């Protein structure tokens, strides 16, 4: 247990500096704006929506079905709201638990010694894990890894207890349940069933490729055949259910998410997809350059066979095949019988093979292994003979490295990223085992004490460097500004664009504008960046420039409803009402199919209809305005704030002298937002009109109480007082209104008019 505890402690300690971090990048959509986390949303919605809160069967859904992760976010939200500390704490604790389980699994393969300790420490400290642990949405990968390892350890127990029917099938049931839970944390968790099969065939039974089919067909190995068959059946069932639940359709992604998938060139797609695993392996070997996002042009396409990066591809697959060949072609297997190894004339109790004496003598360094002697036989020999050979571990390590990574290779369907560091969380287990078993083999191979010490200190140094890099990289995840600045050299377009949003929120307008323009320099057709720059210019009254960028954004993405919305608002304010009307109408007709964020799209469409209704209202077309408002109410999403829409409905009914309907919608507006000032003023006017003077005055006074700095509130109250012939009080209200809103022509003009009435009287 010491190795497990120490490794877990290191995993915990290295990420303590993330507890003070804020929400970053994808955390915003998955947590801060995800309606599935709110208490008013039925918790069952989690099982019908994707990771980002979109209905799983929607054409624009990401199809990432991770209900257990979303459920953990909801529990976090219920306990601590939107305090990021508690979310980060759960991530760190999960990583520590996964590290302990990985170390425990390593002990099954490497024994209770230095090499297990090394594997655990390497996994705890590997910098590739920073995105999964420091980024809160990475919890999906960490949680999937937890149940991945639990499933694998259950299967190890299942193999070692064969012959005890109740116990062995109890462990198998645990394998299946944990595999299902792993998949419900993240899709790649289901691959643990394939890794379990590899363990059973190549590690537990130590079969060679040519022995597999003959062996599983023999009566003596029916248990192996049954186990593999059940693993296959359960894996197929889980995948079938997963595909059915997401509507039997793959997700659709934009060109910027995965440029290779959108390339017209078969050669470019093929060369790039073959190269990407090489790039991922390099990130595991040398995690010097890490980024929050590897989309767009972060990894340029390989368009010709002359691209020098193809040499990396050839070297990678050659090395992979060589490793697999060496692992599968083991001369010591010749003495096997039906997949069962024989040691000292007796079958091994757990089915593991015997090793050569040289390997046993050198595979572990700890003197404690040779300490206790009973009946003239060293216990260490008994323990060591139960460990798999180096070749076995290589095969299992390769399966851990490759199989969980297969869903990210674009082999079966296109994915929405070029590289994703957090996807490497589970494959890194295989990588850490490969490095460890390689170091162990090298340690055994060399004879000189100096060289053995060199291997020992080299591995220790690697772990130290990994730990230092992890601690430093965690600093980049403290807040979004630091994170995006760190990603500029890898993905400048995305990093500059996101940095512009952060700088704008900090009111650093000129810096934000420069950041947006830098992003567009690297990728000029980014609709979101064009829109964001237009919005910044609009907010700074540079309307002509803003319109230019909104039109460019619409040209780049004709379905960008928010660009239509702001274009229409500018045109309406410029008096170009007919052009504004056409813009709002066009926006309202855009469907939400194949859109990443249909909720945001629906909000923009609803806002367009609201503004179109206001346009009709200002032109005196109240019936048309009501018709548009009703359409807006039908289309608005759950998260849309409807108080202004309801208030305008009431205004339209009031202008049509339909006072009961007007009162209904004013009350609806106040119910949806009790401190909505316009509804207090309009409802107060209706109450005064219907003779409920005292109630009306209360609403006017409440509006003033809600915002004492708003001159318009005093103006409406003054008008009410004037109608009640309370001239002195009305004059005071008019004077206050003019002082507070001295730049508003309507307020000053009405105040002057009201102040003149007492003089005339």
PLM region spans:
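TPR/TPR-like (Sel1-like) alpha-helical repeat modules
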Residues: 584-592, 731-745, 756, 761
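Polytopic membrane enzymes that build or remodel cell-surface glycoconjugates and lipids
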Residues: 1-575, 592, 604-606, 611, ...
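Conserved structural position within tetratricopeptide repeats
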Residues: 489, 520-521, 552-555, 586-589, ...
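TPR/Sel1-like alpha-solenoid repeat signature
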Residues: 496-503, 515, 529-540, 549, ...
């Amino acid at each position: 247990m010491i190795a497990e505890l120490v490794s877990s402690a290191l995993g915990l300690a290295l990420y303590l500096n993330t507890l003070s971090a804020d929400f970053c990048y994808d955390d915003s959509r998955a947590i801060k704006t995800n309606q599935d986390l709110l208490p008013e949303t039925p918790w069952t919605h989690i099982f019908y929506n994707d990771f980002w809160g979109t209905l799983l069967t929607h054409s624009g859904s990401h199809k990432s079905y991770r209900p257990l992760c979303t459920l953990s976010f909801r529990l976090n939200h219920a306990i601590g709201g939107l305090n990021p500390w508690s979310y980060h704490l759960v991530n760190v604790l999960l990583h520590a638990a996964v590290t302990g389980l990985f170390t425990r699994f390593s002990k099954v393969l490497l024994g209770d010694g230095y090499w297990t300790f090394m594997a655990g420490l390497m996994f705890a400290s590997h910098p590739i894990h920073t995105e999964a642990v420091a980024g809160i949405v990475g919890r999906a990968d960490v949680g999937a890894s937890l149940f991945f390892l639990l499933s694998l350890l259950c299967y190890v127990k299942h193999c070692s207890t064969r012959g005890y029917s109740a116990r062995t099938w109890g462990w198998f049931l645990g394998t299946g349940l944990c595999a299902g839970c792993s998949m419900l944390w993240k899709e790649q968790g289901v691959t643990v069933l394939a890794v379990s099969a590899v363990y059973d065939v190549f590690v537990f039974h130590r079969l060679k490729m040519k022995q597999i089919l003959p062996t599983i067909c023999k009566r003596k190995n029916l248990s192996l055949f049954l186990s593999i068959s059940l693993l296959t059946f359960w894996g197929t069932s889980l995948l079938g259910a997963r595909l059915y639940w997401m509507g039997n359709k793959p997700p659709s992604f934009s060109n910027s998410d995965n440029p290779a998938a959108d390339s017209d060139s078969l050669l470019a797609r093929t060369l790039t997809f073959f190269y990407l695993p090489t790039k991922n392996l390099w990130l595991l070997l040398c995690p010097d350059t890490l980024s929050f996002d590897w989309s767009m042009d972060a990894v340029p396409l390989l368009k010709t066979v002359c691209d020098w990066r193809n040499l990396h591809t050839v070297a990678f697959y050659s090395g992979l095949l060589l490793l697999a060949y060496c692992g599968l072609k083991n001369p010591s297997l010749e003495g096997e019988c039906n997949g069962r190894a024989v040691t000292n004339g007796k079958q091994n109790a757990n089915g593991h093979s015997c090793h050569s004496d040289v390997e046993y003598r050198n595979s572990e360094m700890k003197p404690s292994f040779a300490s206790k002697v009973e009946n003239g036989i060293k216990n260490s020999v008994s323990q060591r003979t139960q460990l798999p050979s180096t070749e076995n571990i290589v095969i299992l390590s390769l399966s851990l490295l490759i199989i969980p990574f297969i869903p990210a290779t674009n082999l079966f369907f296109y994915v929405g990223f070029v590289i994703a560091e957090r996807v490497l969380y589970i494959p890194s287990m295989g990588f850490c085992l490969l490095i460890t078993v390689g170091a162990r083999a090298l340690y055994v191979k060399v004879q000189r004490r100096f060289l053995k010490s060199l291997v020992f200190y080299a591995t220790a140094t690697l772990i130290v460097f990994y730990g230092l890099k992890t601690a430093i990289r965690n600093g980049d995840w403290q807040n979004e500004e630091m994170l995006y600045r760190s990603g500029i050299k890898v993905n400048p377009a995305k990093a500059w664009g996101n940095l512009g949003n952060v700088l704008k929120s900090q009111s650093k307008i000129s810096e934000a504008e420069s950041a947006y323009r830098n992003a567009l320099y690297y990728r000029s057709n980014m609709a979101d960046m064009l829109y964001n720059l237009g919005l910044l210019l609009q907010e700074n009254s540079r309307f002509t420039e803003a319109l230019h960028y909104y039109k460019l954004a619409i040209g780049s993405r004709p379905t960008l409803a928010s660009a239509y919305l702001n274009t229409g608002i500018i045109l309406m304010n410029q008096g170009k009402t007919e052009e504004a009307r056409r813009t709002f109408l066009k926006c309202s007709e855009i469907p939400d199919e194949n859109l990443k964020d249909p909720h945001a799209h629906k909000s923009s469409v609803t806002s367009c209809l609201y503004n179109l209704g206001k346009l009709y209202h200002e032109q005196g077309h109240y019936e048309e305005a009501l018709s548009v408002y009703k359409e807006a109410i039908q289309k608005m999403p759950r998260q849309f704030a409807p108080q202004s829409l309801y208030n305008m409905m009431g205004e339209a009914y009031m202008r049509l002298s339909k006072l009961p309907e007007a009162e209904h919608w004013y009350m609806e507006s106040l119910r949806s937002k009790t401190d909505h000032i316009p509804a207090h003023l309009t409802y107060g006017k209706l109450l005064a009109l219907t003779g409920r003077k005292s109630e009306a005055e209360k609403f006017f006074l409440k509006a003033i109480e809600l915002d004492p700095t708003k001159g318009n509130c005093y103006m409406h109250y003054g008008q009410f007082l004037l109608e009640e012939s309370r001239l002195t009080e009305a004059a005071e209200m008019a004077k206050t209104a003019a002082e507070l809103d001295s730049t508003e022509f309507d307020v000053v003009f009405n105040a002057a008019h009201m102040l003149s009435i007492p003089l005339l009287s």
